[in-house]
Amino acid sequence: MADYQTVRTQGVAQPPAAIDEGLRAHMSKVYGTMSVGMLVTAGVSWAVGTSPALLSIFRDPVTLSPNILGWIAMFAPLIMVFAFGAAINRLSAAGAQTFFYVFAAVMGLSIAWIFAAFTGLSIAQTFLVTSIAFASLSLWGYTTKKDISGWGSFLIMGVVGLIVESIINIFLGSPAIAFAVSIIGLLIFAALTAYDTQRIKNEYVQHSHAMDQEWLDKSAIMGALSLYINFINMFMFLLQFLGNRE
């Protein structure tokens, strides 16, 4: 999604101090947008997951497995990510931000089942562990002098493999495959957190001289989306190991 728009290259070069100040503001917007998205997801998932009436809309009353609406809710976030990437050039910054928050709400709907499957305490504890791990990895990605841009292709291939294996295991129902996917997925999205943080930082440093505020605003939203997805996946994979079943 890094190539979602064409950046103007004309402009007056900014002094390092201006870049540092602008970068801090840019990263604050990225993390702020991501945090609001997390709150939206948490609110929707809690509201649906703790309401038997709402939860019953998305699962079979006898088997408790997802019904048609449940499957749609589960796959909707994945479809929306691809749609977001394809539409970002045509969206305004305000439109992109609205799309992101709608996506966060749909994501909350897709993971609402965790409140019926795991205890509230274990969900909270897993969220705390994920937050600490995410913050540490993102900080390392931001501050490291090591160029980790080469990780990108490998990690994207890993994500594609995870998606394929997860879909296959929906039909196989293999605990061994589910365990392997959780371990590998956790490692991949942990690495993506550091990688995406450095990428977001470098994109700003390389293109901030263009002074295109619309581009910077959309870049911050796309950065927030990337980090949000990493956080959600780390949380869901960790929940498989740390969550206590109801």
Walk through the language-model features, giving the residues of each.
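A hydrophobic alpha-helical transmembrane-helix feature that marks the membrane cores
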Residues: M1-E246
